[in-house]
A protein has these predicted regions:
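Bacterial signal peptide processing site
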Residues: 19-21
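Terminal, low-structured helical/coil segments at or just beyond the last alpha-helical repeat
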Residues: 202, 211-243
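Short helix-capping/linker turns of helical repeat alpha-solenoids
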Residues: 50-53, 66-68, 86-89, 102-104, ...
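Hydrophobic face of amphipathic alpha-helices that form TPR/SEL1-like repeat modules
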Residues: 59-66, 70, 95-102, 130-138, ...
């Protein structure tokens, strides 16, 4: 009987071990497939970019900046973004601003960052205003001004940029206007993505603490769960502590 038990246990261990190996093999294979697809995409975009395709140049700049599916290369990001910016591509101008703002591959230069973001906004880039707002809110290279930050975030919000909407919500929360902050947080609607995650988490916080709304563990839990589905680890921690 004991012998049969030992054999059965060994079989289970073997099956479990094989399962883990197969999972690792599948994950490795998926990573290789994604990498190959991205390499093919970069090759195609590079061919177009070298022929003067401005959109291809801007997209290459963004891919190398974000490191999506490949290793980030800030030097190449700047190179391609500058080529596109020379031809009035406003997304490229914004990405140049990010490189200077964060000091990615270049020395931090808030003046150049602000100038690049301003150019992108002048051209109608929807995401550019959020960065001007962030710089104004935190006094990065410009005089710290919540009024200016609000102004820029409102431009972004009116262009449909949810990050600007979230930033506006946080500004109103700072001054105790919770009703207004909730209005902006709820612009996430039923989206489930990383942009919406902090908005759901913020709503969960307000309901958990009864700020601007009647305290409701049920509502807080629902918003934290949405935030978790959208990729927030912090919301997971808050949900565990929720009483």
């Amino acid at each position: 009987m004991k012998k049969k038990y030992i054999i059965a246990t060994l079989i289970l261990i073997l099956v479990f071990s094989c399962g883990k190996k197969n999972k690792r093999a599948r994950n490795s294979q998926n990573n290789v497939t994604l990498e190959n697809k991205m390499n093919d995409k970069i090759k195609e975009l590079t061919e177009k970019a070298n022929k003067g395709d401005v959109e291809a140049q801007a997209e290459l700049g963004e891919i190398y900046l974000q490191g999506d599916g490949i290793k980030a290369d800030y030097k190449k990001s700047m190179e391609w973004s500058k080529k596109a910016a020379e031809n009035k591509n406003y997304r490229a101008m914004r990405n140049i601003g990010i490189l200077y703002l964060e000091g990615l591959g270049v020395k931090k230069d808030y003046k150049k960052a602000f100038s690049s973001f301003s150019s992108s906004v002048d051209g109608g880039d929807a995401q550019g205003p959020r960065y001007l707002g962030i710089m104004s809110e935190n006094g990065l290279g410009v005089k710290k001004s919540l009024d200016d930050a609000e102004f820029y975030y409102e431009i972004g919000d009116s262009s449909g940029d949810l990050v600007s909407s979230y930033k506006l919500g946080k500004l109103y929360e700072k001054v105790g206007d919770y009703a207004k902050s909730i209005e902006f947080y709820k612009k996430a609607e039923d989206r489930i993505d990383k942009t919406a995650a902090p908005m759901y988490e913020a709503l969960g916080d307000l309901y958990a603490n009864g700020k601007g709304v009647e305290k409701s563990t049920k509502e807080a839990r629902e918003y934290y769960e949405k935030a978790i589905k959208s990729g927030s680890q912090e919301a997971q921690n808050k949900l565990v502590k929720l009483k």
